[in-house]
């Protein structure tokens, strides 16, 4: 009983330390560590709420910007993400963390969810990001949202500058 309690406390401390990792930690260092999680809710195509050791955290998928729910493809992308993550074990690799939220790579069965979204034309890669080539390939194919004549980037829909 004592041994189990000690392991639980040590495990919780490890998860807390990972989630509290400062935003200044470099992606190489942060992405090497992952924590097991499950999905609590899919907010939209690039935002999910996960649970790690009884703690919930809102995660923005790193490297992509998916259509907002009020845009064409927004609900379809959310449905795709829901199908990918609900009821499945996730590995969350924190890149930046704040209080109860963060940016992360999310792996499902070893597959990077951000990468899948970019490959299938379901999200824009962030400008200059490593997934930019995948977005360009999807656009050339065309597939996903690139089947539309002039898809509106989500940052324009929100009235912001480029992602």
Where are these regions (language model features)?
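Small beta-barrel nucleic-acid-binding modules, primarily SNase/OB-fold domains
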Residues: 2-163
């Amino acid at each position: 009983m004592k041994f189990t309690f000690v392991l639980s406390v040590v495990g919780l401390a490890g998860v807390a330390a990972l989630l509290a990792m400062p935003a200044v930690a470099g992606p190489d260092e942060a992405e090497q560590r992952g924590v097991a999680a499950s999905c609590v809710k899919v907010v939209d195509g690039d935002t999910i709420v996960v649970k790690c050791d009884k703690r919930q955290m809102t995660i923005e998928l790193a490297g992509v910007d998916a259509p907002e729910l009020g845009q064409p493809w927004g609900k379809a992308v959310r449905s795709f993400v829901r199908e990918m993550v609900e009821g499945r074990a996730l590995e969350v690799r924190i890149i930046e963390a704040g209080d109860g939220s963060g940016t992360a790579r999310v792996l499902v069965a070893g597959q990077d969810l951000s990468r899948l979204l970019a490959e299938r034309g379901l999200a824009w890669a962030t400008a200059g990001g490593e997934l930019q080539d995948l977005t360009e390939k999807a656009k050339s194919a065309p597939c996903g949202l690139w089947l539309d004549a002039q898809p509106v980037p989500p940052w324009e829909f929100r009235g912001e500058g480029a992602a």
